[in-house]
Swiss-Prot record:
GO biological process, alphabetically ordered: endocytosis; protein transport
Gene giving rise to this polypeptide: Synrg
List of residues that carry Phosphothreonine: T1115
Identification of the protein by name: Synergin gamma
Motif extent (DFXDF motif 1): 555-559
Length: 1329
């Protein structure tokens, strides 16, 4: 601490001291003291970490300690990847040379370099995709975040800040955006407090993550990112902490106060130093978070690390992750106490250092809070010292810069209004520009000084070359000012494009390194990374994450060293190293990170996500040293998970994996998917995963805008599955992680999982927050459902389940209970409850798996498929079941194992309820999932929009699957809120859950309080919950309807049992409807809507109609139409129901038509004066009105034919038809005054009747009248007859709409929607026809 020479230094010093307490002689230099060299300062920040851990320090110092870096694998890997994270960007690989100042390059073995380079390249490509995808996702995420904000205020706060501070950066930090989504994590945080220890660690991390998300703005804002570590605990506080006003210590203190630190955490805070005592809180909180959130916390921590990146945050993150993470991995799921203990140990050693770092960092960050991060901030604060000569040396400033300066200079300074169009002409996304601005604008907010302008232009130029400008320090890499390409200023040509681009590949990391400063900052200067590049932060964090992931390997070595030393200080140093390492990793992951970094806008989320993941990895390692048991456990969990399972490869794999996976948690977890590095390149390779994911995601996103948002976080990460992917990402992440290191990696997998989840939760968290909020361990607000679910499922870990625990609960459940599928089934909680929860969890896990599976199914990555498939089937289960990931995957897997297939995942959610069915469901699931994934994956998701839709999909599923689903349904309904997203995200899981959700809604909600919690719909009563879930009646009904259809086989029974089964006939009707709907509607909108709808549904369960309606907006007709019927006849079973349904629907239709016609008749009859009446009727409005009435009558005529065709007998229907004819005949008298009287032929639709032999009759049948949508009355009437009656011309008559798998006559659908109910009935043509 003594070394805190300055704010920047203090951050470094804090970090330095944090690790060793006194031993950390981190030079404040790191704080950004280092003047010009962003990297170096970062490194220095990292350096402090390095000091403690020289090997890592070298990495941190990267440049300074190239020797250290080369110290060994650690030095090599950790050094740059881990330690030099700051420089890591540079050391990325061989890229350290990019920085040139770093001899870190040697750190990586040629293979590593090669891998990194390749992965970097892939990442870069994927990131490019991600950027676009994430831009879209950002929009979605922003919307979702808004929803989320509604659901979770805290996240909202963070989001607001983030939005305000870095709306642009938001795009950049899409991952962060997701993190913001993850911000719900903050929402979760509140829950986390429930489980102070686990909760806490998770919370901190979560906040970190959230903050990371917010870090978009927060990181960029300042060290807040760091604060987020503690702050996230309380979103408000984090933001406060973000604010310089809130001293880090204070923030930490607040955090500590806000989220009681677990025993371990408390010690940590003390361990951290008095000053850091507060910080320790943060640290502790962080650690706690780490523990609690395990994966997410780690991820978030990583994110936090990235975010905070400042030594403090990084340290904290590291410490927390170290303590928390490690604890999390080993005990996160297993035992909060253990975690706590571990956390305590780790935290004590680690946190203390990190805390200090955080405190210092915080101060630093507070100082430079405006700036990216403390580290970055310091780097950035001393912008000029760090600025290359061509920025402050007038003689070296390019003419292009001067020209722009002259153009924008006014007497009052540089006119931002004039500069704006110039910057916009660079073609960079607003988020990227916002990020750059945030990084450069340090003097007067909103106004740039000359040097800042030059910095902005240079960073724009660098970014245009594909090298993310993590911080102004990056510019030090350029001997001459890079000239941006501005359409307005042709003179600016990016000459060095190729070089930077090259850098991007290799130097990408290095540039990030420069940026890397932030990256370094990420370590110590995490804030630099996080803050400096809050925009970058997301990026950077991701970067650090990446590196951290890599770091894991390196870190592991480092940690091992640290572990060997066994000194907590050392550990912390190690941990610090990890941050440094993280930076290094970042560097290392430069490959991944650079790519990540490069797609600053979109990458951020991924990056962040990954960052979190990485961070987790790194953290974990750091924790390793911190607590031997924990350390070993944690890191080993991680390490095991990664290095162990993927042990060796993981180092590389992790590096490359992370590197590759760095892009997003998903990649990460995808990587997990592709355990082998080979896979990582393909799948792991973000490019593949992300490419596919991105592409798929893009498709998905295209398909499913929501997906974009949800997936954005998740999707981008999970790219593979559209909706499912998001969840997959989060869950898959877990899963994949476990998958990746299945054997040993299991534990790590959970960490990874958690981490990924965190990261997913960060990224996915955003998504997860979107849906992850729901499904993800209750990522945050919505996460309540999940949290509840989690808590619910994790009765044992009820408190934790909330937010962190959600994951953790999930995790814990996975760990202890999840280890055995039983957990999922009921090991943890009450059979129903736990089963449910577990099921839910498993569903969630499975969902992840499913998502993953679906994801793999949907994902281009076959690897993922294979891996996950295995993982899904049983390999994952068996392998992962041991580890934390196992915990998660275990539940996941167990469910899977139970089911033996992806479906099994869902099946487990049924608890043991449909174990028998599970097997069949298994195959069916997988088959169906695959089928759906391929064909209806989207559909499934679409369906998943409403549980009813899912059931539909499942309806398509083989009945066996359906039945399994049925039981599962009960559970899923509850999870539906959580799983609504989940469902959305994972087609299979989703679909199963979805319909299961419906059932489960009923079942579960009735079953458990969890339902209430789960009831995102907020319907407390089971019935309500069911209804609320989808919409009370529609939702439940929809669900039921679909469910009944889906559980055609056993599920039907189950459904019936759940009183959700409609009628078999109905089921079949719906099923057939679904068949068309599934593919037609579900595929595109539903999936897109899926997340949104789900969110909506969950968010607004009360408006039953509205929700279904919303869903309906996507899968309106199917869901609405079928659900309505089902709704009504939900309790009915048998053939009668079908007929009754027709009678019921037509009765409503004719009743409404009678009202319309009668009103018209009464209105006209009410006009005493025939002259006035004639005038009214002949007026434009009168004619239009009567034309509408005529159309309504024509609908009744069509329905009448449908009634006759289906032989539906009902006195009420007959009476209604008679009444309508009476009123109509009366009304014709008035119409005779105009030319409106319809020709008899226009009312004769007998030619539209569908005969039994007609092919595709089901597709041609109108969902309202069951008549052929392609036939028109004009066939009966001659064209001549038609001509005078414009209302019935062939054009109008032929209008038909497709919705929910059904086609409708435009007039039928419009009448139904406007006069009967908002969702079309989706009646199926009876087979009897």
């Amino acid at each position: 601490m003594a070394l805190r020479p300055g704010a920047g230094a203090s951050g470094a010093a804090g970090a330095g001291t944090g690790p060793g307490g006194a031993g950390s002689f981190m030079f404040p230099v790191a704080g950004g003291m280092r003047p010009p060299q962003g990297l170096i300062p970062m490194q220095q920040q990292g350096f402090p970490m390095v000091s403690v851990m020289q090997p890592n320090m070298q990495g941190m110092m990267g440049m300074n300690y190239s020797s250290q870096m080369s110290q060994g694998p650690i030095a090599m890997q950790a050094g740059i990847p881990m330690g030099p994270m700051p420089a890591a960007g540079v050391p990325f690989l061989g890229q350290p040379p990019f920085l040139g100042m770093r001899p870190a390059a040697p750190q990586y073995t040629p293979d590593m370099q090669k891998q990194f380079a390749e992965e970097q390249q892939k990442r870069f490509e994927q990131q490019q995709k991600l950027l676009e995808e994430e831009r879209k996702r950002r929009q979605f995420e922003e919307q979702k975040q808004k929803l989320r904000l509604l659901s979770s205020v805290k996240p909202k706060t963070g989001e607001k800040n983030r939005d305000d501070a870095l709306e642009a950066i938001k795009g950049n930090l899409d991952g962060f955006s997701r993190d913001a989504k993850m911000h719900p994590t903050p929402a979760s945080h509140p829950k986390k407090p429930d489980c102070p220890t686990s909760s806490h660690s998770t919370k901190t991390v979560s906040p970190s993550s959230a903050f990371l998300g917010e870090d978009e703005f927060s990181g960029f804002m300042q060290g807040p990112v760091e604060l987020p570590t503690c702050g996230p605990s309380s979103t408000a506080q984090p933001f406060q902490s973000f604010l310089p006003s809130t001293p880090l210590g204070q923030l930490h203190t607040q955090k500590a106060g806000a989220q009681p630190l677990p025993p371990g955490q408390a010690p940590v805070s003390f361990a951290v130093h008095g000053v850091h005592g507060q910080i320790p809180c943060l640290s502790a909180a962080s650690a706690s978070h780490s523990m609690q959130k395990a994966g997410p916390s780690l991820e978030e921590k990583l994110l936090v690390s990235c975010d905070i990146s400042a030594s403090g945050q990084e340290h904290i993150k590291l410490s927390s992750p170290e303590a928390g993470h490690r604890a999390v991995v080993p005990g996160s799921s297993k035992n909060s106490p253990g975690l706590m203990a571990h956390n305590g140990g780790a935290v004590d050693g680690c946190v203390s250092g990190p805390t200090t770092a955080v405190a210092e960092k915080t101060s630093d960050q507070n100082l430079s809070k405006e700036e990216s991060g403390v580290g970055v901030f310091p780097s950035q604060d001393p912008v000029q010292p760090r600025m290359p000569p061509w920025i402050y040396n007038e003689s070296l400033v390019p003419d292009a810069y001067k020209k722009i300066l002259e153009t924008t200079m006014t007497p009052t300074g540089i006119d931002t209004a004039k500069l704006y169009p110039i910057l916009m002409s660079s073609g960079l996304p607003r988020e990227t520009l916002g990020q750059i601005w945030a990084l450069a604008n340090r003097t007067t907010p909103g106004k740039l000084t000359k040097e800042e302008l030059y910095t902005v232009l240079a960073m724009v130029a660098v970014t245009q070359r594909g090298v993310p400008a993590m911080s102004p320090d990056t510019l030090n890499q350029f001997p001459a000012a890079p000239i941006p390409t501005l359409s307005g200023f042709p003179m600016t040509l990016p000459t060095p494009v190729s070089q930077p681009t090259a850098m991007t590949s290799g130097p990408a990391g290095s540039i990030p390194l420069s940026l890397g400063q932030p990256i370094m900052g990420i370590n110590l200067v995490g804030p630099v990374g996080g803050a400096a590049a809050p925009t970058s932060s997301g990026f950077m964090p991701a970067y650090p994450s990446n590196q951290v992931g890599k770091t894991e390997e390196d870190d592991f070595q480092d940690f091992q060293d640290a572990s060997k030393s066994g000194s907590i200080d050392d550990s912390f140093t190690d941990f610090q190293e990890v941050p440094a390492s993280s930076k290094t990793s970042n560097s290392q992951h430069g490959n991944s990170a650079p790519s990540l970094l490069i797609p600053l806008p979109g990458t951020k989320a991924s990056t962040d996500k990954y960052a979190v993941f990485k961070g987790i990895s790194a953290e974990k390692p750091s924790e390793n040293p911190a607590s031997f048991g924990e350390s070993g456990d944690k890191y080993s969990a991680f390490r095991e998970l990664e290095p162990t399972a993927d042990s060796k490869p993981l180092g590389e794999s992790f590096a490359e994996f992370r590197s590759t996976g760095t892009d997003d948690g998903f990649t990460d977890f995808k990587t997990a998917d592709s355990v082998s590095p080979l896979e990582p390149p393909t799948k792991d390779s973000f490019p593949s995963a992300f490419a596919s994911g991105a592409a798929q995601q893009t498709q998905t996103q295209v398909k499913t805008p929501l997906n974009l948002a949800d997936l954005d976080m998740f999707s981008s990460v999970d790219c593979s599955g559209e909706k499912p992917v998001p969840f997959s990402a989060a869950f898959s992440t877990s899963k994949s992680v476990s998958s990746r290191p299945q054997p040993a990696g299991s534990a790590a997998a959970p960490a990874s999982l958690a981490s990924t989840k965190a990261s997913s939760l960060a990224d996915d968290f955003g998504e997860f927050n979107l849906f992850g909020e729901y499904s993800n361990p209750a990522s945050v607000g919505e996460q309540d459902d999940f949290a509840d679910f989690m808590a619910f499922g994790n009765s044992s870990i009820p408190s934790e389940p909330k937010a962190d625990d959600k994951y953790e609960a999930l995790r814990e459940e996975g760990s202890p209970g999840a280890l055995s599928t039983s957990t999922v089934e009921g090991a943890h909680n009450p059979p129903v409850s736990s089963s449910k929860y577990d099921v839910f969890k498993q569903l969630s896990l499975e969902g992840a798996g499913l998502a993953i599976e679906e994801f793999k199914e949907n994902t281009p990555s076959t690897k993922s498929d294979g891996d996950f498939a295995d993982f899904h089937s049983s390999k994952f289960s068996s392998t992962s079941s041991d580890k934390s990931l196992g915990e998660k995957a275990v539940a996941f897997r167990h469910a899977k194992e139970d089911s033996a297939s992806v479906k099994s995942l869902d099946l487990p959610s049924i608890g043991g309820s449909s174990v028998g069915k599970e097997d069949s469901e298994d195959a069916l699931s997988v088959q169906f999932d695959m089928k759906l994934a391929d064909v209806g994956g989207d559909l499934k998701h679409v369906m998943s929009d409403s549980s009813l839709d899912l059931p539909t999909v499942s309806g398509q599923h083989p009945p066996a699957a359906g039945s399994a689903l049925a039981s599962e349904d009960a559970l899923p309904e509850t999870p539906f809120p959580a799983f609504a997203s989940f469902k959305d995200m994972m087609p299979q899981t989703t679909e199963q859950k979805e319909y299961e959700s419906g059932d489960f809604q009923d079942f579960t909600r009735q079953d458990m309080p969890m339902v209430d919690r789960s009831q995102e719909n907020t319907c407390p009563s089971p019935a309500s919950s069911v209804a609320s879930h989808e919409t009370p009646k529609e939702g439940a009904d929809d669900f039921g309807e679909f469910q009944s259809e889906k559980p055609k086989i056993s599920k039907f029974d189950f459904l019936v049992a759940n009183s959700q089964s409609k009628m078999k006939s109905s089921e079949e009707m719906i099923k057939s409807e679904l068949a068309t709907f599934d593919l037609s509607v579900q595929g595109s909108h539903k999936r897109s809507l899926s997340l949104g709808d789900k969110e909506i549904s969950r968010s607004s369960p009360s408006p039953a109609l509205e929700q279904p309606f919303r869903d309906r907006s996507n899968t309106l007709s199917e869901r609405a139409a079928l659900p309505v019927i089902r709704d009504k006849y939900k309790d009915l079973t048998g053939e009668v129901e079908e007929n009754e349904r027709y009678a019921y629907e037509w009765q409503r239709c004719l009743g409404s038509a009678l009202d319309v016609i009668k009103k018209a008749n009464d209105t006209l009859n009410g006009i005493s004066s025939s002259a006035v009446c004639t005038e009214v009727i002949q007026s434009a409005q009168g004619m239009e009105y009567l034309l509408g009435v005529v159309e309504v009558y024509r609908v009744t005529k069509r329905v009448e034919l449908g009634i006759k065709a289906t032989a539906v007998c009902s006195e009420k229907l007959q009476q209604l038809l008679k009444d309508i004819d009476k009123v109509w005949n009366n009304l014709i008298g008035f119409m005779s005054l105009t030319t409106l009287t319809p020709d008899e032929n226009s009312l004769d639709f007998s030619s539209c009747m569908l005969r039994p032999g007609i092919k595709n009759a089901q597709e041609l049948a109108c969902g309202v009248c069951l008549l052929n949508v392609d036939s028109r009355s004009r066939k009966e009437e001659t064209p001549a007859e038609e001509q005078p009656k414009k209302a019935f011309n062939s054009e109008t008559d032929s209008f038909k709409l497709a919705y929910g798998g059904h086609q409708y006559h435009a007039s039928c659908a419009n009448f139904w929607i406007n006069c009967v109910e908002p969702k079309p009935p989706g009646l199926l043509l009876p087979d009897l026809l």
